[in-house]
């Protein structure tokens, strides 16, 4: 298992709020918790930034982290990420903040310590552009959205 440096920024982490862990041996994502002093109520359509109390430094440029919504919160309550997906670059060292958006119909209260997002680590390839006049022909060509049909 790859080791990622983590710094605890809020003393309640590990005392009141556990460090992120994988829920099962097959889990892809680590659950991130709301490191809040008080509950935060999100009205429909509202967004807020929620601290995690943690900073990570991936250091390896062949890796990045992605923050994703938790499926139950999104499906049952309309709570998703305000930026849809959060990308954490390998050289970022600041606090992990979660942009939370209530796209649901009802207000939702985020409780201190509540699991509100998940983080996965993904491989990264840094590519360099090769300037060309034309591309080699493919079956698809320039076919865009809906090109392959629905059936």
From Swiss-Prot:
<dbReference type="GO" id="GO:0006226">
    <property type="term" value="P:dUMP biosynthetic process"/>
</dbReference>
<dbReference type="GO" id="GO:0046081">
    <property type="term" value="P:dUTP catabolic process"/>
</dbReference>
<dbReference type="InterPro" id="IPR036157">
    <property type="entry name" value="dUTPase-like_sf"/>
</dbReference>
<comment type="function">
    <text>This enzyme is involved in nucleotide metabolism: it produces dUMP, the immediate precursor of thymidine nucleotides and it decreases the intracellular concentration of dUTP so that uracil cannot be incorporated into DNA.</text>
</comment>
<dbReference type="InterPro" id="IPR033704">
    <property type="entry name" value="dUTPase_trimeric"/>
</dbReference>
<feature type="binding site">
    <location>
        <position position="97"/>
    </location>
    <ligand>
        <name>substrate</name>
    </ligand>
</feature>
<comment type="similarity">
    <text>Belongs to the dUTPase family.</text>
</comment>
<keyword id="KW-0378">Hydrolase</keyword>
<keyword id="KW-0546">Nucleotide metabolism</keyword>
<feature type="binding site">
    <location>
        <begin position="70"/>
        <end position="72"/>
    </location>
    <ligand>
        <name>substrate</name>
    </ligand>
</feature>
<dbReference type="GO" id="GO:0004170">
    <property type="term" value="F:dUTP diphosphatase activity"/>
</dbReference>
<comment type="pathway">
    <text>Pyrimidine metabolism; dUMP biosynthesis; dUMP from dCTP (dUTP route): step 2/2.</text>
</comment>
<protein>
    <recommendedName>
        <fullName>Deoxyuridine 5'-triphosphate nucleotidohydrolase</fullName>
        <ecNumber>3.6.1.23</ecNumber>
    </recommendedName>
</protein>
<dbReference type="InterPro" id="IPR029054">
    <property type="entry name" value="dUTPase-like"/>
</dbReference>
<feature type="binding site">
    <location>
        <position position="83"/>
    </location>
    <ligand>
        <name>substrate</name>
    </ligand>
</feature>
<dbReference type="GO" id="GO:0000287">
    <property type="term" value="F:magnesium ion binding"/>
</dbReference>
<dbReference type="InterPro" id="IPR008181">
    <property type="entry name" value="dUTPase"/>
</dbReference>
<keyword id="KW-0479">Metal-binding</keyword>
<dbReference type="Pfam" id="PF00692">
    <property type="entry name" value="dUTPase"/>
</dbReference>
<keyword id="KW-0460">Magnesium</keyword>
<feature type="binding site">
    <location>
        <begin position="87"/>
        <end position="89"/>
    </location>
    <ligand>
        <name>substrate</name>
    </ligand>
</feature>
């Amino acid at each position: 298992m790859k080791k990622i440096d983590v710094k605890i920024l809020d003393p309640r982490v590990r005392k009141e709020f556990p460090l992120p862990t994988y829920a099962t041996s097959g889990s892809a994502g680590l659950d991130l918790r709301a490191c809040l002093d008080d509950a935060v109520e999100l009205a429909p359509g509202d967004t807020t930034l929620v601290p995690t109390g943690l900073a990570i430094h991936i250091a390896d440029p062949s890796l990045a982290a992605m923050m994703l919504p938790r499926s139950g919160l999104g499906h049952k309550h309309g709570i998703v990420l305000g930026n849809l997906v959060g990308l954490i670059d390998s050289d970022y060292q600041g606090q992990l903040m979660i942009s939370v958006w209530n796209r649901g119909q009802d207000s939702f209260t985020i409780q201190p310590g509540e699991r509100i997002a998940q983080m996965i680590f993904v491989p990264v390839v840094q590519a360099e552009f090769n300037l060309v006049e034309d591309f080699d022909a493919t079956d698809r060509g320039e076919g865009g959205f809906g090109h392959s049909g629905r059936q």
